[in-house]
Amino acid sequence: LTFKAHTVNQDQRTSLDLTPDRSLHLGNKFSLSFDIKLREELHTYGYVFRIISDDTSSCLDFISYQLRSRFNFILNKGSSIVENVDFIDSTQIVKDEWIKIRLDFTEQGIKISVNEATQMMRHSFKDFNSLSFLFGSNRHPKYYTTDVPPVSLRNIELYNQDGRIIRCWKLALHNRKGETMDEV
């Protein structure tokens, strides 16, 4: 899935809501992984995803800024930033190559992996009960954004506490309108 970003009108920017009908209840231990490829455009900043808890209480943001070879993972509670984890690496965060992203959520923290590099966010999602997964642009009442980075995504997978895949979006099939037609 290739995101339409800053080169198009805000209303035409890519939005992918993995939980359009209802939020997911995953417990305190689960994982999310996917592949991301960065494209070079004039503006390279934007929200890859927002994982929102209980509709408004907390949010985990993944922000890409390819111009600076930088990924930010920011945990917000209410209107405050709880923690910010940066990956800045011009050898790993490069355009036109697939980069593996994996987040492992536990009660102790969130292990974030970008290819082989790993960092730990010492705050957990233990107070996150129902989760919404929003990629790119979204119209959420509290976490609305149209800042979409020029990226492509594939192979989004959610794992349960036993490491078993419970959801998989390959993002390989599209119609002429750009809508994803994958199996879920």
Which residue ranges define each predicted feature?
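Flexible glycan-contacting loops in extracellular carbohydrate-active proteins
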Residues: 121-152
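Extracellular/lumenal carbohydrate-interaction signature centered on repeated Trp-anchored short motifs
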Residues: 20-32, 89-97, 104, 146-152
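Extracellular, beta-strand-rich glycan-interacting domains
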Residues: 36-40, 144-175
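Extracytoplasmic low-complexity segments
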Residues: 1-24, 162-184
